[in-house]
Amino acid sequence: MTAQLIFALTLLLTLGVFAFTMRRIFINFRYTKKKALHNIPARLRETFKVAIAQEKIFRHPVMGLLHALVFWGFIVILFGSIEMVIDGLFGTERVFGFMGWFYNFLMASGDIFAAIIALAILVFLFRRLFLHVKRFYGPEMKPVSKADANLALSFILFLMLSLLGMNTFYLLEMHNEGHAFVGVYPVSQSLADLFAGMNDGSIIFWHNFNWWFHILLIFVFANVLPYSKHFHVFMSVPNVFVSRIEPLGKVDNMDNITKEVKLMLDPSAPMDSGAEEPIEKFGVSDANDVNWVNYMNALSCTECGRCTAVCPANITGKLLSPRKIMMDVRARMKEKSDGLIREGANFDDGKSLIGDYISEEELWACTMCNACAQECPININQPSLILDMRRYLVLEQSKAPSGLNTAFANIENNGAPWQFSPEDRMNWAEELYLNEK
């Protein structure tokens, strides 16, 4: 009974801290711009294909397979974690054992996946510590980012080792007490043979130790994740669901500008009621100007660097790093959060996303090729955010590279981006030989 009370208090503390942290993060969504979601069936298909089946991660076949196995393994092992919580609260042992063959299948799968995940994590740590993969580095990747990744991987490694240890000593304890064990544990059964000579007291101690170590590690890890780049453990699946399902090259129009153009072409054209509402600002200049999907993208970013690794601007030495864009949005929102909560959307601390975090040079280096969005394993759309920041610079600040300003002037004066009079547009054909009929 004492153990159950301690467990219940620990669980309550864990849930309380987690709820407080998540509230601090998700309250920021109220300060972002609205964005409607359509075509739910297509979103569900995209979620299954990209998030569950891990389709895009397999563009790097070997490491992609290891990552997918870790993801699928966590889904299977989650069943056992839920069982542990129930056992801890009610003092039971393997409470879901009544499920029979299905329980045996899940336990066997979880046992095998625990070993696979442990090996995969060792490979990931080796790559990070010794192989120096280029995309793991960059000006935006501070030492804390590298330490964060190593810490999270270490958490996962110890979670898997403690799970295997718990199963191993559970089998030994049941065998020594003459009880039939519940479930099937192929890997742990093999490990149990290595400890068969231990005395009963040691076996019971190590079973209890691994059980408590594993569940407490889960509780701690759950509360560390929201402060880590590995927050994508929670955010990646919902992020894929809300991600863009239209073609990546499609540019969303700005409703207010579309309205003005329609009125210029046809003053009697009917307007949507929503288009009549005035807006405070064109584009994005600060973190709370982004729409809620952009903010979810920023929270979900794993900092894996796959986007930056394929960015033609970054490859050719430009300042732009799509990964940095998402990291900056997240960091700026975190910095501004307290003020927004205290004073509302009008809070101004004298800083902004553009200028203090992201330079104009970075924004104009983007070619809008969408390579980053196509490569991102969780469908983050960096170009849409870059485009909105460019819109702010042009429409609100009248700032654009000289080449664009020339094109704008030509469009205004000549109806085309080129510096020729409309009357001269067919001059190129004067010397062509045309057969007359």
Predicted regions: what they are:
Residues L5-I6, T21-M22, P61-A68, I75, ...:
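Peripheral terminal and linker regions in Fe-S/redox and tRNA-modifying enzymes
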Residues P270-A298, T308, N314-F420:
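Ferredoxin-type iron-sulfur electron-transfer modules in oxidoreductases and energy-metabolism complexes
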Residues R24-N28, I215-L217, C304-A309, C366-N370, ...:
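Short acidic (Asp/Glu) and glycine-rich catalytic loops that position anionic groups and cofactors
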Residues M1-P270:
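Membrane-embedded alpha-helical bundles of multi-pass integral membrane proteins
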Residues A3, F7, M107, V293, ...:
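Short, glycine/acidic-rich beta->alpha junctions
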Residues L65-W72, A147-D148, F155, N297, ...:
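Short, well-ordered loop/turn elements at secondary-structure boundaries
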Residues K56-L66, E83, D286-A298, E303, ...:
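Aromatic-capped, Gly/Pro-kinked transmembrane alpha-helices
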